[in-house]
Amino acid sequence: MKEATARQIADMKMQTIGVEVEMYGITRRDAAGIAADFFGTGRFVDTAHRNGYYTWSAWDAKGREWKFQRDISIDAAGSAEQTELVTPILRYEDIELLQELLRRLRRAGAKSNPAHMCGVHIHIGKGDHTAKTLRNLANLMASHESLLIAAMRIDQSRLGRYCRTVNRTFLDRLNKEKPQTMEKLADIWYEGNSAREGREHHYNGSRYHCLYVQ
């Protein structure tokens, strides 16, 4: 293995991530209970008073909080089953833990598919990223988006609303100006997606893309 490749792999393993998985067929309370049992802590409580979104939380052996929140966009039998798992900050070594938790939830009846407006969100920590590396990421995403969409079977209705592809106006300006600072990159992102107003808001209009730069 080349030294540069080995270094890239080592850096990747240090990357922090947060994952959100939308599901139905299981209540938030039941999902939190299953998680608490899986973690071996048995600790799960209703934390809606603190977290909102009708949240139930479970804690793992490291004291990290795993949230099960309501997402009203999910097509479920009832509001109690509009369940979204929100992980704490994870690292490479936590991937197997997350995978096994999802298997446990699936065996308990949880389902996640595009027909029920379910999706997966992966948040990448800023870490050592620069405006240049994020520009590279945007171009990489744009060139492979169609393959990812096909592989994940993303519903057409989501593509038109929640999972829009990379905006060409944003991408063209990004590659023309090649921003050197995060501040300039942010300007290009929000302006390129016609979402400059209210850019500090959580539900800013630019968020509903397969790739979301925040």
Language model regions located:
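C-terminal accessory/tail domains of diverse enzymes
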Residues: 1-114, 127-214
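Short, conserved phosphate-binding/catalytic loop or strand-edge motifs used
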Residues: 116-120
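Active-site beta-strand/loop microenvironment that shapes enzyme catalytic pockets
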Residues: 122-124
